[in-house]
Amino acid sequence: HSDAVFTDNYSRFRKQMAVKKYLNSVLT
């Protein structure tokens, strides 16, 4: 169970980082 939670949080974290990186590339 803990692995599933960790994977879910990690994928969510990766998505947030991808969105931030995308926004930075668009705004600059």
Swiss-Prot record:
GO terms for molecular function: neuropeptide hormone activity; peptide hormone receptor binding; type 1 vasoactive intestinal polypeptide receptor binding. Keywords: Amidation, Hormone, Secreted. Disulfide bonds: none annotated. InterPro entries: Glucagon_GIP_secretin_VIP, VIP/GHRH-like. One of its GO terms (cellular component) is neuron projection. The modification Threonine amide is found at T28. Its main location: secreted. The keyword Cell inner membrane does not apply. It is found in: Secreted. It comes from the Eukaryota. GO terms for biological process: adenylate cyclase-activating G protein-coupled receptor signaling pathway; epinephrine secretion; mRNA stabilization; prolactin secretion; regulation of protein localization. Belongs to the glucagon family. PANTHER family: GLUCAGON-FAMILY NEUROPEPTIDE, VIP PEPTIDES. This is Vasoactive intestinal peptide.
